[in-house]
């Protein structure tokens, strides 16, 4: 009994009625609830003075009960009500203090006093977070989702699955520009990185458009991979390029790396590839949308390993030989040497592409040996991967695991990983990293690895952190 009293004593008056608890099908009328709001009536012409000079924000209802506001019209002409939060002005001392503050600014001759404004709060007044808290079982929360254009995509823990349809209806109603809500199933469960979607509410329309760092990206969300959480990562990596960079994106998707790189960094060469024909289709659309000349990005639709072994290797050697033999004009300012940047953003599988680099240039050994060491391009590879544990481990373990995964695939005499950037936490025991490798020519010219059976593509099942990570001492 004591525990229940404490629980309910902490509950706010301004929350949806308890009758909606456990609701799985949206019934808006059930959210209607009469509330008596404490108010003070003031002259409408005094509203500006009160807003500027009297600090009442901690006591007013705030902005969570839209369209209800802190200041509303009174029934009397020329009058306004200051609307207070019932929980915050329960004490007589607090109410007296507020009246004194108002009289000090407006004058003691003003007849100010507390009264009550009766209002029905409805579904329209409650925000999504308050509705979810009221509907879901006590102790279970849901507040995180990702929006891509007009599409909201959700992941649900098992205990929330029975409530997915009402959550979807609420999001459809409450989130600006939302027209479609889907449940996002396993990601990257096939070679095309398609999303396994369940339509929960709204239109069955997955063609949408988003803006990222000022660029337009159009896509069929059901047929390509897009993650809005990676916008800073796209900007970080593309910001490493310059006018002498040779950029090769082995898993380009619809262009989140190559488009900003091309427009903002103006690399010497940009070549994009993706195995998914839909990604290639929408990349070409986005090249046009962003007014990029077609010849600035060479686009391929092929396996990433073959792209690395054939297209990247051929292209780099050709350009390097051209640059190393080109004569310099007198008084010409020497240009910095070009660098190779290969991006592999397929975190569930990209680490399996690393063996393709060993010996990728071996068939050009004679030509490369003629290139002076100071004319040989530096090779940088950005390999995205997941480091995950099945038990609680120290935070430092995840970076060590990411490095180990790369070393296991390169099998070189030393680690080729020069930097491991933590991109984001995927779940409580799963981290996403970008491992940056620098590949020496000894590795690129070494005997290639024998072909191995294709590794199974890991599913990227949980996008939301399911719980906070337990701190483990090292």
UniProtKB/Swiss-Prot annotation:
Record's keyword annotation contains Electron transport: no
Protein name as catalogued: tRNA (guanine(37)-N(1))-methyltransferase
Single GO biological process annotation from the record: tRNA N1-guanine methylation
Keyword tags: Cytoplasm, Methyltransferase, Mitochondrion, Nucleus, S-adenosyl-L-methionine, Transferase, tRNA processing
Binding-site residues for S-adenosyl-L-methionine, renumbered to this chain: 234, 274-275, 303-304, 345
Keyword Endoplasmic reticulum annotated: no
Lineage: Eukaryota, Metazoa, Ecdysozoa, Nematoda, Chromadorea
Pfam families: TRM5-TYW2_MTfase (PF02475), TYW2_N_2 (PF25133)
Quaternary data: Monomer.
Organism the protein comes from: Caenorhabditis elegans
Family designation: Belongs to the class I-like SAM-binding methyltransferase superfamily. TRM5/TYW2 family.
Amino acid composition bias (Acidic residues), ranges on this chain: 452-464
Compositional bias per record (Basic and acidic residues), positions renumbered to this chain: 465-474
Known role: Specifically methylates the N1 position of guanosine-37 in various cytoplasmic and mitochondrial tRNAs. Methylation is not dependent on the nature of the nucleoside 5' of the target nucleoside. This is the first step in the biosynthesis of wybutosine (yW), a modified base adjacent to the anticodon of tRNAs and required for accurate decoding.
HAMAP family named among the record's database cross-references: TRM5
